[in-house]
């Protein structure tokens, strides 16, 4: 009886009435499936989800936390990492102290400032001082230094919280404000951070040497103050004669920039920067016979930073354009009804202008997507191998209730309907970009399905190949060599 009560208690519904599960059956997997989609959530909710995972398996939860922050191999989520790190410092300080040296390695040095005014503050400041002293020694010897100087807080900042932190850091380093400021100036000059050049109106720097985030952030400043050199750089980048760094720019940032500036008088300049940056994004496309399915329903416009619909559209375009399989340059957009869209246009902006004419802001009928593919296959007697091998569903997971057998989840219903017609349902990747509620589309051992979350296209390469279950996939990611050093 207890087993059946647990099963019944684990059933819930989406905002649109579809059957769903409260949990996958693993709190760590629940977090793994949503941790990249929590930017719009409160700190209280983020911490609650992590505490459940940490209680279930502390080591795995810590690996998951660093995977979420990992800017090179993971999701690159800053807010959720710092929120959880602050909670850990107050409640599980030993776990933080054990992993202190990995914080900047997987993220940035300023992530450590989340430990200010916690039981881990002393150890954090000692760690920063050691790195600072090593950098100052290398600076005196003419060697290279770390990026610590870039991310340390400035005592002359306009934000009072930053000033407070900077003064604490300076005193921990045994310095007064003036000496600390002078040291930071020297370190930043050695690092050649672009902000120094912009502040001094020094446009002699090499665009090819600038980090991706800075290039994207200051693009309009380059147009205003260094038009000729910047335009020449973009032209060279477009022909492959110059390297434009875009490895840490997310596709949604380009989509949102387009949506925010397309009516501006300076859009012709913005357009050139967007096109060049999009072309320079790293390629995680692959060669699978896979098809992206993006949600543009009304709920995908709830929330900001980023707008979930912008994330979904950017990833759909990115994958369709870069995937070399049989569905190249196509994706399905769904709301009330699915639309199979062929991408048209030469440049990123051309394609985006075209795609925005298809948006249908209504409800979230995922069942109709599965039915579209099945109808086309049955009607034309298409062999199984010509169907998409994988459907990558990018959504907030708030699906409509099924028309038939509404007590079953959308996934269970689709599996049944395909089997009745003599087909196997393609593998499904449920990719969450806005987790507003604690509900999951499948449980942990469901075969042929994977649960992921986030805004980075790196996930496309992670989910390539393999008929996995959600839990197996999570373990493959978190037990990889990259996260081996991390433990509670």
Residue ranges and their predicted role:
Residues 1-311, 321-488:
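Long lumenal/extracellular ectodomains of secretory and single-pass membrane proteins
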């Amino acid at each position: 009886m207890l087993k059946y009560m647990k099963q019944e208690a684990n059933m819930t519904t989406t905002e649109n009435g579809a059957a769903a599960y409260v949990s996958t059956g693993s709190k760590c997997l629940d977090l793994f499936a949503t941790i990249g989609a929590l930017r719009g959530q409160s700190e209280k909710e983020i911490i609650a989800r992590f505490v459940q995972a940490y209680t279930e398996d502390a080591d795995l939860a810590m690996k998951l936390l660093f995977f979420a922050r990992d800017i090179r191999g993971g999701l690159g989520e800053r807010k959720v990492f710092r929120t959880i790190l602050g909670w850990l410092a107050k409640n599980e300080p030993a776990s933080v102290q054990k992993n202190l040296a990995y914080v900047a390695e997987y993220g940035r040095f300023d992530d450590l400032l989340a430990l200010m005014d916690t039981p881990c503050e002393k150890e954090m400041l000692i760690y920063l001082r050691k790195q600072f002293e090593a950098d100052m020694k290398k600076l005196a010897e003419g060697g290279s230094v770390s990026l610590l100087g870039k991310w340390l807080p400035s005592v002359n900042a306009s934000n009072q919280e930053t000033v407070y932190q900077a003064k604490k850091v300076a005193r921990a380093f045994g310095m007064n404000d003036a000496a600390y400021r002078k040291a930071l100036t020297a370190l930043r000059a050695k690092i050649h951070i672009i902000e120094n050049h912009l502040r001094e109106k020094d446009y002699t720097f090499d665009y090819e040497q600038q980090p991706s985030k800075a290039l994207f952030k200051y693009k309009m400043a380059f147009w205003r103050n260094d038009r000729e050199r910047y335009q020449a750089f973009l032209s060279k980048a477009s022909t492959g004669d110059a390297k434009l760094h875009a490895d840490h720019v997310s596709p949604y940032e380009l989509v949102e920039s387009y949506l925010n500036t397309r009516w501006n008088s300076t859009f012709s300049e913005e357009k050139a920067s967007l096109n060049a940056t999009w072309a320079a994004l790293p390629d995680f496309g692959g060669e699978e016979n896979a098809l992206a399915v993006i949600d543009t329903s009304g709920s995908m416009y709830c929330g900001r930073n980023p707008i979930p619909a912008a994330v979904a559209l950017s990833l759909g375009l990115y994958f369709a354009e870069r995937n070399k399989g049989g569905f190249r340059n196509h994706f399905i957009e769904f709301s009330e009804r699915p639309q199979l869209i062929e991408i048209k246009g030469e440049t990123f902006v051309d394609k985006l202008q075209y795609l925005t004419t298809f948006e249908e802001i209504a409800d979230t009928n995922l069942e109709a997507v599965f039915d579209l593919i099945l109808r086309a296959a049955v009607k034309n007697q298409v062999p199984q191998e010509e169907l998409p091998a994988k459907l990558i569903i990018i959504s907030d997971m708030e699906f409509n209730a099924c028309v038939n057998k509404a007590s079953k989840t959308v996934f269970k219903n689709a599996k049944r309907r395909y089997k009745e017609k003599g087909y196997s349902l393609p593998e499904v990747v449920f990719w969450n970009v806005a987790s507003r509620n604690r509900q999951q589309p499948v449980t942990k051992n469901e075969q042929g399905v994977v649960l992921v979350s986030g805004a980075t296209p790196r996930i496309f390469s992670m989910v390539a190949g393999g008929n996995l279950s959600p839990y197996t996939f999570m373990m493959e990611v978190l037990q990889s060599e990259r996260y081996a050093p991390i433990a509670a």
